[in-house]
Regions:
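Residues in the recognition helix of alpha-helical DNA-binding motifs
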Residues: 20, 34, 50, 79
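Short alpha-helical DNA-recognition segment
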Residues: 25-49
Length: 85
């Protein structure tokens, strides 16, 4: 799959995923396990790479992050405008 990088970012939700994960007191490993229950094949290392902005996030992964973290998609995407500055 071709890697798309937007303004030097592989994803635009890394900070928000980490913020909500920590706020909910969920470890990266626990988040990965919750994602796997939903059928998304990610492990703790993948969560770490996503949070460090080293890995892209697919649309179905984004939907599952929202479910696992109990947030709406617009909450994860709310700072999108800052990537245009």
């Amino acid at each position: 799959m071709k890697q798309i990088i937007f303004n030097n970012n592989k994803n635009i939700v890394s900070d928000k995923i980490k913020k909500y994960r920590i706020k909910r007191k969920i470890s990266q490993g626990d988040l990965a396990a919750r994602m796997q229950v939903l059928g998304v094949n990610v492990n703790q290392q993948a969560i770490s790479r996503i949070e460090k902005n080293l890995r892209q996030v697919t649309d179905y992964e984004l939907a599952c992050f929202c479910k696992c973290l109990d947030v709406k998609p617009d909450e994860l995407l709310s700072d999108f405008d800052k990537y245009f500055e």
